[in-house]
Curated annotation (Swiss-Prot):
Single GO term (MF): protein serine/threonine/tyrosine kinase activity
Xref: Pfam families: PB1, PK_Tyr_Ser-Thr
The name this protein goes by in its record: RAF-like serine/threonine-protein kinase 24
Biological processes annotated in GO: auxin-activated signaling pathway; cellular response to auxin stimulus; regulation of auxin mediated signaling pathway; response to auxin; signal transduction
Residue(s) carrying Phosphoserine: S474, S555, S777, S1013
Biased composition (Polar residues): 769-782
Domain Protein kinase: 974-1239
Biased composition annotated in UniProt, kind: Basic and acidic residues: 457-480, 493-502, 550-576
Keywords from the named record: ATP-binding, Auxin signaling pathway, Cytoplasm, Kinase, Nucleotide-binding, Phosphoprotein, Serine/threonine-protein kinase, Transferase
Protein family (similarity comment): Belongs to the protein kinase superfamily. Ser/Thr protein kinase family.
Gene Ontology CC: cytoplasm
Highest classification ranks of the organism: Eukaryota, Viridiplantae, Streptophyta, Embryophyta, Tracheophyta
UniProt xrefs under SUPFAM superfamilies: CAD & PB1 domains (SSF54277), Protein kinase-like (PK-like) (SSF56112)
Amino acid sequence: MDQAKGYEHVRYTAPDPRDEGLGSINQRFSHDSSTNVNTYVRPPDYGVSTPARPVLNYSIQTGEEFAFEFMRDRVIMKPQFIPNVYGEHSGMPVSVNLSALGMVHPMSESGPNATVLNIEEKRQSFEHERKPPSRIEDKTYHELVQSAPVISSKNDTGQRRHSLVSSRASDSSLNRAKFLCSFGGKVIPRPRDQKLRYVGGETRIIRISKTISFQELMHKMKEIFPEARTIKYQLPGEDLDALVSVSSDEDLQNMMEECIVFGNGGSEKPRMFLFSSSDIEEAQFVMEHAEGDSEVQYVVAVNGMDLSSRRSSLGLSPPGNNLDELLHGNFDRKIDRAATEPAVASLTPLAGNESLPASQTSQPVTGFSTGNEPFSQPYLGQQLQFPGLGNHQIYTSGHMASIGYIDEKRSAPLHVQPQPHYIPYSVNPETPLESLVPHYPQKPEQGFLREEQIFHVQDPETSSKEAKMRRDDSFQKVNDHPISTVESNLSAKEPKMRRESSTPRVNEYPVSSMPSDLIVPDDLPKEEAPIVTQTSSSTPDPSSSTLSEKSLRKSEDHVENNLSAKEPKMRKEHSTTRVNEYSVSSVSSDSMVPDQALKEEAPISMKISNSTPDPKSLVYPEKSLRTSQEKTGAFDTTNEGMKKNQDNQFCLLGGFSVSGHGTSNNSSSNVSNFDQPVTQQRVFHSERTVRDPTETNRLSKSDDSLASQFVMAQTTSDAFLPISESSETSHEANMESQNVHPTAPVIPAPDSIWTAEGSMSQSEKKNVETNTPEHVSQTETSAKAVPQGHNEKGDIVVDINDRFPREFLADILKTKESLNFPGLGPLHADGAGVSLNIQNNDPKTWSYFRNLAQDEFERKDLSLMDQDHPGFPTSMTNTNGVPIDYSYPPLQSEKVASSQIHPQIHFDGNIKPDVSTITIPDLNTVDTQEDYSQSQIKGAESTDATLNAGVPLIDFMAADSGMRSLQVIKNDDLEELKELGSGTFGTVYHGKWRGTDVAIKRIKRSCFIGRSSEQERLTSEFWHEAEILSKLHHPNVMAFYGVVKDGPGGTLATVTEYMVNGSLRHVLLSNRHLDRRKRLIIAMDAAFGMEYLHSKSIVHFDLKCDNLLVNLKDPARPICKVGDFGLSKIKRNTLVTGGVRGTLPWMAPELLSGSSSKVSEKVDVFSFGIVLWEILTGEEPYANMHYGAIIGGIVNNTLRPTVPNYCDPEWRMLMEQCWAPDPFVRPAFPEIARRLRTMSSSAVHTKPHAVNHQIHK
């Protein structure tokens, strides 16, 4: 002890190399009071030489002596180099980062040495790590041995530093393992190569003890990711499909052992993934449906968009496949949350993160959910306080309301404020957030309201004068009919609904629209705009009853949420809504209804006020609809949560979508004051059919009705029309919705609504802007519906979805939408374009399309399925549960309801189709094909009767009186000679039938696979079309002989005319010596055949040389016949052999643009122009071009086949006119046939010269 007190100064002349870096007791301890740092300053060297003596090591704190060898073994040998804290530039090691070892020196916590600690790492370290007994036993020694001296290297300047080390340093580093920890993302396939990738979320490097237990690990993981439910890890070099789950201590031990092996090999670290319960379910769904929506999911995940899938009664469903919407940021996480937060917490401007502590920034709160939030918790009511607007009470009568997350930048604390009758909440920036949100152990289905729930807002204090215009606009006065106001009170006296009945009735009373009193102040911050519903008001001041620029939009979109009923009880069996003894009106304001999907038992309450303003005082701004188009694109949510067989939705009310269950979600959750870019409107059309009142009780599957996307023109005719029952087929380019609605009163006259079948005058077209309508002019002609199948010019109007698979059109439309061709445009006179908001875009460059469509269709070269594909439930059921066939265009008559509604929309994923209703008075439709119509009517009526009787469908179809003209051929009468080819549609054989050469097409059973109702419907379609084909007789149309129904295994087959030389494509490739005259004859025959088909109202849609059959037996007169034009209902399910790539070059721009689902027969004329080029050159168009380039070039009219120099001027002119971008310019087939006949006649008198060239493949 004396030596320790004397501090002898001894110089070591020959220190042991092993001892370098350790030092001895011969160092002076001093305390630097100025810096509060414990330093160890070595005394100067006096050059004293002494004999070798043992090294004595003492503890500075206790003075106890201990063995040097023991200390050497316990101290880490590799110090870290850090800058000299005193500024001296010595290269010696001076300090060890204790925080990296999980330890802190007790004497240096507050000094500069504390800067070595990684504060962030310290904060994120695990505080509950298990302490083994050995570590506790070593505690005394750990306190004793806190430091060791350091000896400099040979180049040491003499300054030496004491290093703070721990006796447990080496043990701590060896007992911990580093992992990459990822959470919050998704494992989904990359669209380009379908390889699994983890995208989105966060990734951190964590360090855990190798001896940690599984329970402790889970606890620590939940500190990082509170929603963690499953832990999986990925070994280096393994793919994401080889993740290993950790669910027990044994699994954890195996993981640690694997990590030790890979950790010693290099810097590559094993990766750990934390998954929540929803992540697992979502990943499984994405994998099952990766083909249809992987790109959208990938883009969402990569960009961190908050677009979580939601549950429906049929399973998880992606909220939307409109990639363009995503790319335009409509579903950006922060923006999306803003749609739900303002109603709850975002009421005052807040700077930075001052609104809430960090611990509260992701606290779930009750609010209006767009369906994208991951949690839902119940509340019954809340009162919102808006600056300058007073209180607005929001009631939710029911079980659950969705909950969104508050963003730290847009939030305010909330507190409870008692109110009578309900459990209200008041937004108050002085109360903590937790007091508002009740916590429940079980969360409901994500993003949806529970049953028996409604939203409404009351504005008791706002006066009607606040509804004055805030902006300068020109106005037009409306008619003098009385207009009543809706008291925006969705509360119901009897909010409960029973599943047994939901029977809304609508009759007797007129409907009108008027403004609301609530106007959001202009000075209210855009992101703080409250989400409220329309408010009640007394009789407005006639001088102040004006509609704001943005108000008409909301009344269009949200009247469905503003109706209240005296008897709101609903039954599931009957789905009509009762609106008796009241006048219903639409309220317009700058407030909005929460976009919630009211589920099956949501009451449709209709509480109507009796105040009636002076109608002459109501003025509508011209630009109100323009604002509607500009603003409603901000948050276009989708509600896939509707359950099967639900029908609580109204039809358009004066151009407004009135929905009992809130499924009309065309931007209905938009925050009106958000300045968001205009979302590309979805392609959405209407086919309106007056229905018999007895048929309005049909149930439906509803997911995403966009009925209110229809724009109502300002009317100058009567505002009140008789109320009638109707049905509407809703068409949408990329989201399915099929919803049969009950009837509702209609405000506008027939000339005030643009119908999909209606036609517009030229003056109307001029008044409709191609991008976003500035205003909607009053209509000048009555917009009566065009007869089904024809427009006013006599052209054939058909549905493209009737002939093309849904995925095929989905891919095309997806590409098209990415090209920024928004929704709908005005209807052309020939029905070629039906649109409300089509944008006139400048042609894009080649590089744009190339980048856009890169790998877009790489894996699409296969048969694709249509919306009516078996297994995809499109048929509905009536009240008796009998499947109803909705395969053909509706047939209308005044007193006979159609039992068929045509599927008009492109379906995607598992979303069910939506058939909505609308009342269109004076709707006259004339069927275009008598035989076709009769067969449909008979088939539909007798189908139901047969199903009820339990008779097999095929037997019934064959025996149907309307199909007696169809020949049923016995399979035993056929003799198969040779297989000609096979594809997804089936196999074609050359055979004999009663001594005649025939082509036998055996249809694969897969074309009819699915549920029994789907098989029945598809089989019904097959028989109907076969019966139509059997009635076609023309020398240039392939003859249809009959149908075989008793083929091998019960398969169906068709027997048609056999053409010796096969397809024209085969002939052009093999026979290079067709002279000009023969080519003209072949083209002329094809034109004759198409003229005949069009005269029978049949559009081919797939006209190309592969589908033109030729017979060259007579060298003087070749024969060409049009084939493969029938059985579209079956054929479209397979899209013939060759898939997508074999169809694109012949498709007209209107088919690819997606601006309309209604096209004319001129699409065949476009295809015929490409056929003329094929006949001329013998080559395939665009053989080496990418799919996306073909689509972009055709749509933008920058791509057509190159016409060779040897082409005759007449041929060239005819070709170019046929493939003209404007359908009006294209000639009809009678004109084409006449010109080809003239050219052929002139060719007889001239020597063939030009076309005898050598054709190159």
